[in-house]
């Protein structure tokens, strides 16, 4: 096929001239293959690079139900760009999806990522994917594929967006849906590692108002590192707990905080009453509240306030659950109880 005729001095165009560097994409794949290889587990068929990623459901499941989740990192990325810190957002990406599917009792099996940018910086992208692979290792799932989209003009230089997709499996008879939660059950709170990945639009507004020195020491590390601490992944300790005692319900404390996420697992007619004095409010949340003048109710509705996962068990199992999770390295508190709802009352109240 002959190219169309053009002006005598015009040169032929390439994809690189249009802003897409295929060689950079190939270099990225070579850089990230070792990271993905470290996440391999039983069930993975083939490696990265195929048109589709293949995974065989483990034979230990008699009636496997697949559970899927997808999420991003939100405007925490804007802070990552400002700080030029890209090594933690990959774990955030994995955590947001695997913690979500864990809530229904699912074991995460595999993960795929989507990385979109205007101009591909191979080193930055590789750093992000290394974090994704680390998150997959922490949750026992395989990084089996993904997409890197270089789209000139779509994103400002130095910026990118992320999306993640997790698929897990749970035995049909062991799906956790909150249907067995009853009056008198105990709500346990597992400590968060920080803000996690929700509420960063408000965080950034507070930073804009307070104009702090982000490199200054904040309780033993820089304020920047404290703000960017990666989302905690609760998969392995909670999967182990489920093997030992009945977990009636779980809530991943994301956007909406405690007051909007716990109701998602409660039957109509039940309320979780939480005691805000039952666990310590971490210094970072105190700092945000003070410098932003944020009301208590708004704090509980936007941030996790130190609790990244809520677990509901019977009162008889509460102490054993706390002991098991503590032995696994989690900080756990009894933060509330389940009772009958009062007329016109929300399904989660903080007192």
Swiss-Prot record:
Pfam families: AIRS, AIRS_C. InterPro entries: PurM-like_C_dom (IPR010918), PurM-like_C_sf (IPR036676), PurM-like_N (IPR016188), PurM-like_N_sf (IPR036921), PurM_cligase (IPR004733). Pathway: Purine metabolism; IMP biosynthesis via de novo pathway; 5-amino-1-(5-phospho-D-ribosyl)imidazole from N(2)-formyl-N(1)-(5-phospho-D-ribosyl)glycinamide: step 2/2. Keywords: ATP-binding, Cytoplasm, Ligase, Nucleotide-binding, Purine biosynthesis. One of its GO terms (molecular function) is phosphoribosylamine-glycine ligase activity. It catalyses: 2-formamido-N(1)-(5-O-phospho-beta-D-ribosyl)acetamidine + ATP = 5-amino-1-(5-phospho-beta-D-ribosyl)imidazole + ADP + phosphate + H(+). Its main location: cytoplasm. Its EC number is 6.3.3.1. It is found in: Cytoplasm. One of its GO terms (cellular component) is cytosol. GO terms for biological process: 'de novo' IMP biosynthetic process; adenine biosynthetic process. Belongs to the AIR synthase family. HAMAP family: AIRS. PANTHER family: TRIFUNCTIONAL PURINE BIOSYNTHETIC PROTEIN ADENOSINE-3 (PTHR10520:SF12), TRIFUNCTIONAL PURINE BIOSYNTHETIC PROTEIN ADENOSINE-3-RELATED (PTHR10520). This is Phosphoribosylformylglycinamidine cyclo-ligase. It comes from Burkholderia ambifaria (strain ATCC BAA-244 / DSM 16087 / CCUG 44356 / LMG 19182 / AMMD) (Burkholderia cepacia (strain AMMD)).
